Amino acid sequence: MTLKKTYLWFIIVMLCNLNLTAQTTTARRSSPLTVAPPLSISLSSERLERIDSMLKQSLRDNTIPGAVALIVRNGRIVFHEAYGNADANGKKLQKDAIFRIASQSKAITSTAVMMLWEEGKFRLDDPISKYIPEFKNPEVLVNFKYADTTYTSRPANKEITIRHLLTHTSGLGYGVIDGDERMKMLYHKAGTTDLFTTEPVTIKEVVMKLAKLPLHHDPGEKYTYSMGLDVLGYFIEVISGMSFEAYLQKHLFEPLGMDDTGFYLPTSKGDRLVAIQHKVNDKWENYPNTFYDVNYPIKGAKTFFSGGAGLSSTAKDYATFLQMYLNGGELNGIRFLSRTTIATMMANQTMDLYGNGDQHYGLAFGVLTEQGQAKGGLGSTGTFVWGGYFNTQYFADPKEKIIGIILKQTQGSTGDQTSWKFKQMVMTTIDD
């Protein structure tokens, strides 16, 4: 074989290998999100105006400083509005404002995990120690001394699996926001980084520390909100051979057109980041730095890729991601997930360990049950939902093909009722 033919063969093989990974093309071709009049997709304009009035009234009542709200049906944007201010200095909020979405990152991380699962890279019930050996032989916390943080532990009765990490049943904790003071103290002493940071820390370094700490309980025994999705961010690096940030950029954000979503923002987009605000004597003020620097998306080392809480995004970008799910895993002729995989992700993965029966928990999604639907105002059975630490929320109803997103950036108690009102009122706009 000549050198030229050898080179051509090499190129062909490489191209074939590229097509066998992550997202693939499909004969089905759903369009990117476009704007349409409400009546064209059977939503009531008058009832959408009620939502507009409710949000404006919330500003007058001073329960929120600002919000961006977006409603999509059948892949068409029928409502996309910005209200109030982006900071305490009176800067007007814009529709393309960028928000810290915190735990809404979990759905994106879960999606990336399942894209690799579709390639046959692992099984959901594989022990995580098969890929991250430091998690071998986990221990469960037994006794703890508050005076000096010494503790005793016992061997866990089973290994932590990938499914456990996706469903918050691994027994891992959540450091500074953990509900157990003992875990807060242990995580702090170990120097784990939770949620967000501007320090030169990597997710690998944090995961290595997590692996040495005791668990809340035996894996699979309880639902305990945790850093499991952060562990899976590093797991994606191990499996893919890419940084977690690069994997998401190449296989999700770029092909979906989510141009304003990422762990960190370039300087050119820094002025679009909404300030976090809190109430002081009934007046909105910019939130100060506490256990985290509020400007983490635009300053610092920019090396910590938190799969559980680290992303920032816009309402339209996140709606695009959710629309891919409502399309059965496809958008614009690109297939990201099979509809059969999505069915697995939305199935009850934790049985009766999660919630009060109104929702079950899938693979990083809360999913509305028949009992929840019967209570009203929450969507159809199968509607999937979640939110973020800074007062962001989303829901997507596969039956009615509706997406609702409301994004704010607040901390502390404010009297805000816009989230439940928004969801309830969106569902009443259906006019078919």
PLM regions: where:
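A generic structural motif
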Residues: 84-85, 291, 410
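Structural recognition of the beta-strand scaffold that forms the well-ordered cores
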Residues: 68-70, 80, 100, 164-167, ...
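Bacterial Sec-dependent N-terminal signal peptides
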Residues: 1-28
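A short acidic/glycine-rich loop-to-helix N-cap element
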Residues: 410-421
